[in-house]
Each structure stands twice: as C-alpha cells, then as structure tokens.
Amino acid sequence: MAKTRFNASTVATVKQLVPFDDVMFQKMCESRETCQEIISTILGQDIRVIDVVPQDSIENLQGRSVRLDCLCKLRDGIYVNVEVQKPDNADHEARVRYNASVITANQTPKGIKFRDVAQVIVIYITRFDIFGDGRPIYHIDRVVRETGKVRTDGFTEIYVNAAVKNYDDELNTNVSDLMDLFTDREKLNPEKFPEFSKRKNLFVNTEKGEREMCEKVDQLAREREHEAVLVTLFEGVQDGGLRVTYAAKKANLSLNEFKDQMRLRGFSVPQRRRRTAAAAK
C-alpha cells in the first residue's frame, strides 16, 4: 500500500511543532500514561487516569459547545481539564472558569445532591507568566476575606507557565523541568519523564510519528475550512440573508442537524413566522 504524500508546507509545519502546539498536544494526550505523568507532576502526587479524551467537545446547558484540549477522569472520579495556551490573547481566567462550569454541569448526573456535584481541576499551561509574579506554578484558592481561612467547593484551578524557572523545592523543580520538554523540540528526559519523552520522541524523531502528525495537521486544516464555511452559512441565516433550508443543503446537513449546529455555536435560529388571517387576504 502506497504511503500518503504530504505537501511541503504540511511537512514544514510538522517539523516546527512542540507540545505547546494544540496539534501535537492533542496527539500527546492520546496516551493515557502521558496524561497521567503530566497531571501527577503538576499536582505533586501520584494519580491514576482511567479515561482521557483529547480535544473533547462538550455542551453547556444552553447547547453551546466548548472544545477542550484534554479532559481526563481520575480513579477517584475527579475530572481534570488540561489546557495549553501559547499566545497571550485571551481572558485566561474567564476561560478557566467557563470550562470548569461546563464540565461540572456536563458531568454531574441529574437529580443528585449538591455534595455529589462533579469535582473539577483545571490545569492551564502557558508559555508566558500569566500573573507576572515570577512563579512557575500558581494555585488559586477560595479564601474567606474576614478570617483568611481557605474553603473548598470541589473546583481547583492551577496555572503553570514555561517562562519562569524555579528550583527552590521538588514541585517547582519538577514543573520547571517538565516545561522544558514543552518548549524545546529536541529535548527529552526519559529518566524523569519516561512516558512524555517516549511519546514526544515518536512524533519528533520517527517517520511513523511524523506521518501521524502530518495527517493530523491536514485533518485540522480541513476541519477549519469546513468550519469557516459553516460559520458563513450560520451568519447568513441568522441575519436573514439566507433561507435556512438553502443553507442546510449547502452544508450537506439535514434541516434539524443544521439548526442544532447553529445553536451549538451560539447562533440564533430564526423562527418561522406564521401568516395571520389578515395577512393572507
């Protein structure tokens, strides 16, 4: 069977990727063991991942979807969302809060008591020092202002960055060393991070891994093109410039599927107006 040939721009893109890039991080997170190693390092404790879904899309109560870089379920039932962010071009804390709320609502069964609401940890990894206070890792706690006591509500947010190195203690040292692997394409550390290093080596230094990455880059490019077409159609329908039946046909979707996709992306589906008796005359 002939191997797929990829264009030069795809190959060139793949040869520049590091784990901070969504496409490589997604492939890295297809390995449960790799996710387990990342999370254990950042939490500073051994944990067991029983399920992981890279680039998971889930819906909030209004039907709007959010795309997560990586969502893991731990043995004790806690959900961990790991996000990577290269550019400093978003309201990062609002994104973390939104992700956590959607995961909580999505993973909490109906009719349960509040004490059984899903517990969520969001780990937000950036290339830049998000708070500018010179720490490689930040833990955000709920503190009672009047007493200074820390209260927990089942949500934990942790911010990690690759811009600051600190070797004052074991946690900071481990996090700093792990971030080196996120930013330096050639660097491996099989002694300290065997699973991460093995997975990264596959995509950086082997023909098989490069081929997988090329396939993923091309797949994401096709998805972006398709998404751009859909958004144009959604905007046309929402603004009244296109009939929803025509737009659904152009998108190769059934009418109900098209309307569902509009709602998932936050667009308003125009309601069909009923003709009154007076208007019919």
Model-assigned labels for residue ranges:
Residues 161-162:
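Interfacial alpha-helical end/capping and short helix-turn segments at domain and membrane boundaries
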Residues 2-15, 23, 79-85, 170-281:
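Short, charged alpha-helical interaction segments and adjacent helix-coil junctions
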Residues 1-156, 166-168, 273-281:
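Accessory alpha/beta interaction modules
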